[in-house]
Amino acid sequence: MIYSSVILEEILRFANPSETVWVASKSKGNTKELALAFVMTPRFISKTQIINSKNIIDGWSWQDYTLDKLVRIYIICLISELDGADQLNLLFDTAEINEAVALHAALPALKNPTQFLLRATDAVRSNMGSVFESIAFENPYPSLYFSELAWNQMVLKCIFNDKAIHRIYGLENRANQALADTLSDFAHERWAAGRRVPSQVWRLVPKFMNENLQSDIKKLEQSDNPRDILAAQLVIKEIDQPGSTKEQWKELELPEPIYQV
């Protein structure tokens, strides 16, 4: 599917007359001209908040986007539709933080998204939080294209850095035994140090119970923390009634520093 036309419709809902003229003037350029427009976008486009946005790809949310970011994504899509992979790779190589955020956020809408799989997995290793979050959160690209190893690395990085894993699209669908076992090992390390893990991480284990994980859930049941007790109850319920706990896990989708005692 070609997404640029749908994105343009959304842009025109929020752009003022001068911004509309600027976007129209750049839309017919070649890949080099579009790349220049991508870099220049913040000079001509405001940071108007995008609200009540369309859902054109499952899991791809523009909820926190600004207009200049959406215009950049539109331009990226135009370059992709012109088979401008070389130009996009050049933009990746030279991007400052906000440009990199837009590039990674745009990946699900590109003409040949798998061409940029290495770029996406590199973003998981980025030390720039906003770049990491642009691929990890409200972005279906990892769920669609990451290997199990790359997926697990992304989820674990979120957990280790106390980031909100419920913002990862496809979290339950991509759960796997290796990830569940690693979470158990991580919990044992935290507990040995007198620390906790965020209670909602246990949503990833019901399909993969083994002796170690069963022991972990029993430990949660005996916790003094009501969030841990609720997590244990939800794991048990999910085992008995698969798919029944999705809404209830939302009660645990709150900031919960992993280093709290």
What function would you assign to each model-found segment?
Residues 76-190, 206:
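Eukaryote-skewed repeat-based solenoidal scaffolds used as protein-protein interaction platforms
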